[in-house]
C-alpha cells in the first residue's frame, strides 16, 4: 500500500525542479498521487475499509490544496503538472 523507496526516488527524480528537490509542490503532488492510486486500488478489493477511505479523502484534499497553490503561483506550471500526472481538471 505504501510507496517503495525506489519508486519514491524515481518520482522525485522525475518531478524535481533541481537536484535534491524533495519539497517542491510538484514533487509533493506526484507522491500524493501515487499514494492515492495505491489506496484506490486497495479500496476496490476492501470496500468496507472506512478508515482507509477517510485517509484517501484527506490525501485528495491535501493534493487539491497543493494544486491550488501551484495554480495561484503559475498557471502554466499547473497545467503542465496535471498534464504529466494525467489528472482531470
UniProtKB/Swiss-Prot annotation:
InterPro entries hit by this protein: Ribosomal_uS15, Ribosomal_uS15_bac-type, uS15_NS1_RNA-bd_sf
Pfam families per UniProt: Ribosomal_S15
NCBIfam families cross-referenced by the UniProt entry: S15_bact
Annotated GO CC locations: cytosolic small ribosomal subunit
Similarity comment: family membership: Belongs to the universal ribosomal protein uS15 family.
Entry protein name: Small ribosomal subunit protein uS15
KW NADP (keyword) present: no
Biological role: One of the primary rRNA binding proteins, it binds directly to 16S rRNA where it helps nucleate assembly of the platform of the 30S subunit by binding and bridging several RNA helices of the 16S rRNA.
GO biological process assignments: translation
Gene for this chain: rpsO
Gene3D superfamilies noted in UniProt: 6.10.250.3130, S15/NS1, RNA-binding (1.10.287.10)
Subunit structure and binding partners: Part of the 30S ribosomal subunit. Forms a bridge to the 50S subunit in the 70S ribosome, contacting the 23S rRNA.
A single MF term (Gene Ontology): rRNA binding
Keywords of this entry: Ribonucleoprotein, Ribosomal protein, RNA-binding, rRNA-binding
CDD domains with a match to the protein in the record: Ribosomal_S15p_S13e
